[in-house]
Amino acid sequence: MGAYLSQPNTVKCSGDGVGAPRLPLPYGFSAMQGWRVSMEDAHNCIPELDNETAMFSVYDGHGGEEVALYCAKYLPDIIKDQKAYKEGKLQKALQDAFLAIDAKLTTDEVIKELAQIAGRPTEDEDDKEKVADEDDVDNEEAALLHEEATMTIEELLTRYGQNCQKGPPHTKSGTGIGDEPEPQGLNGEAGPEDPSRETPSQENGPTAKGHTGPSSNSDHGTEAGQIGEPGTATGEAGPSCSSASDKLPRVAKSKFFEDSEDESDEVEEEEDDIEECSEDEDGYSSEEAENEEDEDDTEEAEEDDDEEMMVPGMEGKEEPGSDSGTTAVVALIRGKQLIVANAGDSRCVVSEAGKALDMSYDHKPEDEVELARIKNAGGKVTMDGRVNGGLNLSRAIGDHFYKRNKNLPPQEQMISALPDIKVLTLTDDHEFMVIACDGIWNVMSSQEVVDFIQSKISQRDENGELRLLSSIVEELLDQCLAPDTSGDGTGCDNMTCIIICFKPRNTVELQPESGKRKLEEALSTEGAEENGNSDKKKAKRD
């Protein structure tokens, strides 16, 4: 089913917290893989980033989970390490931290760690020894070729078991080793046809059809079931191909000298004809030359377009942090200040008296500001809203495949890690905050999510206890999950969501009837004590 499972994985990772004593912020979160073949989201719920600051964040990975997990592990400390953070400048600290962690992804040490997170193979000592052994084999083959190049034809034929006096063989052996292929000129060009030497293709045996994948130990060989060009082989040949190619020179060498004189005469005649033709048709030749130049220009332009439209993985090399990345939306709460940094299309929304207040802006390539930066960096946005036909968002941590313009700073690359910052002073009207990846926002609008949570957040069970926030998130994820994958992908993505309340929650609330009943029980107990039944109360306490 391509990028989707046959059945959704609805197992959820959920949790709740009450915040820190100095900054009580009840929160609940849940994450679900859904229809995707893997889970690429990550998040942070840190009630005490320091003594007066809380941090909540969501990372939506793409091309792999490694960058999202790396950010969840290291970004909190990188934020705290920023000079601006220590000076109390949280907005500047967030911007600097996003760019700092993005730059770290290009270092060799971090690339290795990302590869380990992703489970991709890394080069170890065994690999290096294997490469050294292959180099030794190559050196031995080169020495053998050099030795054979200095030998006479008779010595070569003797070495390979042929008698020079027998002349060129014309047998119909089933192996095809002694069969003469169609004559070829120098550098593999076809020579003049000789009707006296017709060789049925059925008599050339299996080696005349080239080699197939199973007989090739080269990554560049043909795939299994595909047949190569007759008499040719690309890459390193396997055992069956190498045995044939080793024996082919014994026939081609002896026959080459027999045909060389006739071929040279024919070539000279053809050259004379070409010279006469060019003298008579100078105008036509110049016109052809102009057409060829136009064709060359067109081909070069097409090659340039192909380079611009390349997407990660097309170069045959996959590198974590280059062909993978993550969105990041980070919220810091210090006192009454809420500071939100966002790069990508994850989102933070605050409920203000029941109305959705967006605290982040989705970064899409077709947006005016984003499109201008992409074009200035040498990129394009396709009709379906993708940068160079690949990524469908314009800001992210990682994705260094799109950040290779050496003439521009990091924040001006096609894909930028520089976050937008929004600040809000919290009041009594601000009830809760929602941070989630686009797996939620592609299904429901900001207001729809706020309304959904608002309708659940005050619900209590039969014992009078408020619902856990994580249970509300779980219900939201189920609400967003698509019934199948037959649509446009909406509801089929990974989903991660966090709800943070700005005020403490009363976990138990006395209902009028239950309060009256408890008051009556207390009065009856006091009356019993006055009547000398204190032993019963003591027994209960014991």
UniProtKB/Swiss-Prot annotation:
Cofactors, names only: Mg(2+); Mn(2+)
BP term (GO), one: regulation of cell cycle
Record text on cofactor binding: Binds 2 magnesium or manganese ions per subunit.
One of the Pfam families matching this protein, by short name: PP2C
E.C. no: 3.1.3.16
Residues of the PPM-type phosphatase domain: 26-502
Entry GO CC: cytoplasm; membrane; nucleoplasm; nucleus
Annotated Gene3D superfamilies: PPM-type phosphatase domain
Region (Disordered): 118-139, 162-325, 510-542
Molecular function terms from GO: metal ion binding; phosphoprotein phosphatase activity; protein serine/threonine phosphatase activity
Subunit and interaction comment: Interacts with NOL3; may dephosphorylate NOL3.
Name of the featured protein: Protein phosphatase 1G
Originating organism: Rattus norvegicus (Rat)
Name of the gene: Ppm1g
